[in-house]
C-alpha cells in the first residue's frame, strides 16, 4: 500500500513468512522482485510483519537489497504472554528510524500469539 505521509509517498508492505526455511527464502526472493517492479528506486519502503526467522538469514537477504532493521535492542514479541524471541521485525529503506515499542499487557496477548510492534520514523 502507498501511504501519504506529510505529502511524501511511503510504500508499506506487510508479510507473514512461512515456517520452512526454504519457503522463506523463496518468499523473500519474490518480495525483492515485487519491490523492484512496483516501488520506484529511492522511494521510502517499510516491510513489517512476522518473518518467522530464528536466525539471521532473512536479515542478510533483505539488507542485500537495501532494507535495514532498527539498530536498537531486540524487541521480543513471541510468544505474547511471555515474549522470549523476536520473530516480528520492521525493515526500512529511505526512512530514519526513531523508535520501536512493544506494548505489553493482557489486552495485547489476548489478541494474538504475537505482540505488536509500533515503529516511528522520520521522513
Please name every model-derived segment.
Residues 1-123:
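Active-site regions of metal-assisted phosphoester/phosphodiester hydrolases
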Amino acid at each position: 500500500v502507498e501511504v501519504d505521509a506529510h505529502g511524501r509517498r511511503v510504500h508499506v508492505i506487510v508479510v507473514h513468512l512461512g515456517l520452512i526455511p526454504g519457503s522463506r527464502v523463496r518468499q523473500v526472493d519474490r518480495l525483492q522482485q515485487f519491490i523492484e517492479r512496483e516501488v520506484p528506486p529511492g522511494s521510502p519502503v517499510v516491510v513489517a510483519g512476522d518473518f518467522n526467522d530464528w536466525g539471521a538469514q532473512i536479515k542478510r537477504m533483505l539488507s542485500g537489497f537495501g532494507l535495514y532493521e532498527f539498530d536498537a535492542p531486540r524487541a521480543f514479541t513471541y510468544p505474547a504472554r511471555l515474549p522470549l524471541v523476536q520473530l516480528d521485525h520492521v525493515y526500512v529503506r529511505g526512512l530514519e528510524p526513531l523508535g520501536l515499542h512493544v506494548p505489553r499487557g493482557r489486552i495485547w496477548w489476548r489478541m494474538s500469539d504475537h505482540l505488536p510492534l509500533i515503529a516511528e520514523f522520520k521522513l
